[in-house]
């Protein structure tokens, strides 16, 4: 019988491998394990330091402003508001070596950092940096001896920097006005009664008799109510480039409009009523009721010299009287706002920037200039106003004045307009209070350099030299899986 032979395979095809060959090859090739199973060595929540094995997200990144190792090599020309710090906390690395190291967060995850900051400042409330040590005034600079025609000029007056109470700043402002008069106006024929700008705290209308239209007690009530600005004709005060109006409690009703100036014309309806002349007054004879024309030193009160006010009013105009007793629709109350005095002169905010640590917000672009660093967090400048109630404030002021050897803040005690304003029973001071702020979770970069830039800028994006201590703690954690 003829034996049947298997048919030959088609041309171009190969037979399947034998069982022995398949089993033999599987022993020589390593088993492939997907990356998601490598959790024990390098998972989605792993943090890898250079030259170190992977770790889990149990680390913290500390941003320290005064590390001794960083000062000489990184921060010799910096300050506590703009500094570099090494975040690789290992004593084996110098700051220069740490700058070559990186902290790598697993690329398969989106990372966030819980950012907490500690900020301490030692900023005074009167300083050039905060535009709170100067203001502009328009004063009489000369008076012609022949024609008696006055000349007015603008002057920029500067206060000494320091941390003062509200009444101390008012005294310094008045002293600056008087010193300008002594240096300029007095030499050009200007009289003391023509000092046309005065900062006060009294309510000049107390004791006003609507029938006689005079202040019948014969003197203005020596009690503080609210800071005030008193102007003479032709004079003005400008707070456009000054924040002292916040200390006086005088603000614009529309704060975003450009410029802030108080002129004599703006204070319509705020004329200060004249005093009753007690030397000629007889209670039984009404014809003896006359306004006081001048003080004991012969300084005129300029009674009846403003045709818009009347014969029993001085030509001095008070912002406080114009605001409370003037026309609310067309007067100064329609343009300005009486607010609580802020002895900090208007505290501002500060911005935190961590350009090498946090991802840039979508509204910012990367920058190498501190004034343009992307902002990742913000908080108020840690400067607070403290108010105290002192029932003996005026007594303390008079006692201090009696014990002083000079009357530098009360040069004209005989004149009821120019005398030193009384101190308020509510005394305010500014105080630097350390702040601890939780800024929440911010998106982190997956590759973090070993040396970080940290910048704290003010509202004008300037580096603040008054920052005394700035610390930051960032705790990384996984937010979600990265999707593409």
Swiss-Prot record:
One protein family per Pfam: Adeno_Penton_B
GO terms for cellular component: host cell nucleus; T=25 icosahedral viral capsid
A molecular function GO annotation: structural molecule activity
Alphabetical list of InterPro entries matching this protein: Adeno_Penton_B
Protein localization: Virion; Host nucleus
Keyword entries, A-Z: Capsid protein, Host nucleus, Host-virus interaction, Late protein, T=25 icosahedral capsid protein, Viral attachment to host cell, Viral penetration into host cytoplasm, Virion, Virus endocytosis by host, Virus entry into host cell
Database matches in Gene3D superfamilies: adenovirus 2 penton base, domain 2, Penton protein, domain 1
Gene Ontology terms describing biological process: endocytosis involved in viral entry into host cell; virion attachment to host cell
Pro residues composition bias: residue spans: 7-18
Gene induction: Expressed in the late phase of the viral replicative cycle.
Function: Major capsid protein that self-associates to form penton base pentamers, each in the shape of a pentagon, situated at the 12 vertices of the pseudo T=25 capsid. Involved in virus secondary attachment to host cell after initial attachment by the fiber protein, and in endocytosis of virions. As the virus enters the host cell, penton proteins are shed concomitant with virion acidification in the endosome.
Similarity comment text for this entry: Belongs to the adenoviridae penton family.
Name of this protein: Penton protein
Organism: Porcine adenovirus A serotype 3
């Amino acid at each position: 019988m003829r034996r049947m032979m298997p048919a030959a395979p088609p041309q171009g095809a190969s037979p399947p491998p034998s069982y022995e060959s398949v089993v033999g090859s599987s022993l020589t090739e390593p088993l492939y394990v997907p990356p998601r199973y490598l959790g024990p060595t390098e998972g989605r929540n792993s943090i890898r330091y250079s030259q170190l094995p992977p770790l889990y997200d149990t680390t913290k990144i500390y941003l320290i402003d005064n590390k001794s190792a960083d000062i000489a090599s990184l921060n010799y020309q910096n300050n506590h508001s703009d500094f570099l710090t090494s975040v690789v906390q290992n004593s084996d690395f110098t700051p220069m070596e740490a700058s070559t190291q990186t902290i790598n967060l697993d690329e398969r995850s989106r990372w966030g950092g819980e950012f907490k900051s500690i900020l301490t400042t030692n900023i005074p409330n009167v300083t050039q940096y905060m535009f709170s040590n100067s203001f502009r005034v328009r004063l009489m600079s000369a008076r012609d001896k022949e024609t008696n025609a006055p000349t007015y000029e603008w002057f920029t007056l500067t206060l000494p920097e320091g941390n003062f109470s509200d009444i101390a700043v008012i005294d310094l402002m008045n002293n600056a006005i008087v010193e300008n008069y002594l240096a300029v106006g007095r030499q050009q024929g200007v009289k003391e009664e023509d000092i046309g700008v005065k900062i006060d705290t009294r309510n000049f209308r107390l004791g006003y008799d609507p029938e006689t239209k005079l202040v019948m007690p014969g003197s203005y009530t020596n009690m503080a109510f609210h800071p005030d600005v008193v102007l003479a004709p032709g004079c003005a005060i400008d707070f456009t480039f000054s924040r002292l109006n916040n200390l006086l409690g005088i603000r614009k009703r529309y704060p975003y409009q450009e410029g802030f100036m108080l002129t004599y014309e703006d204070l319509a309806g705020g004329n200060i009523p004249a005093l009753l002349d007690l030397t000629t007054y007889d209670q039984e004879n009404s014809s003896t009721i006359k306004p006081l024309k001048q003080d004991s030193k012969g300084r005129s009160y300029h009674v009846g010299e403003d045709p818009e006010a009347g014969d029993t009013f001085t030509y001095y105009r008070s912002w406080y009287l114009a605001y409370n007793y003037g026309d609310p629709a067309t007067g100064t109350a329609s343009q300005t706002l009486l607010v609580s005095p802020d002895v900090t002169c208007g505290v501002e905010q500060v911005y935190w920037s961590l350009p090498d640590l946090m991802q840039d917000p979508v509204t910012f672009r990367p920058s190498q200039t501190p004034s343009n660093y992307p902002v990742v967090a913000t908080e108020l400048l840690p400067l607070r106003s403290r108010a105290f109630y002192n029932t003996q404030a005026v007594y303390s002021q008079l006692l201090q004045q009696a014990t002083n050897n000079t009357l530098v803040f009360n040069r004209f005690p005989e004149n009821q307009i120019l005398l030193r304003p009384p101190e308020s029973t509510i005394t305010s001071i500014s105080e630097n209070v350390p702040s601890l702020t939780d800024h929440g979770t911010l998106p982190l970069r997956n590759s973090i350099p070993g040396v970080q830039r940290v910048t704290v800028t003010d509202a004008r994006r300037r580096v603040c030299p008054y920052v005394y201590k700035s610390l930051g703690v960032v705790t990384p954690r996984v937010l979600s899986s990265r999707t593409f």
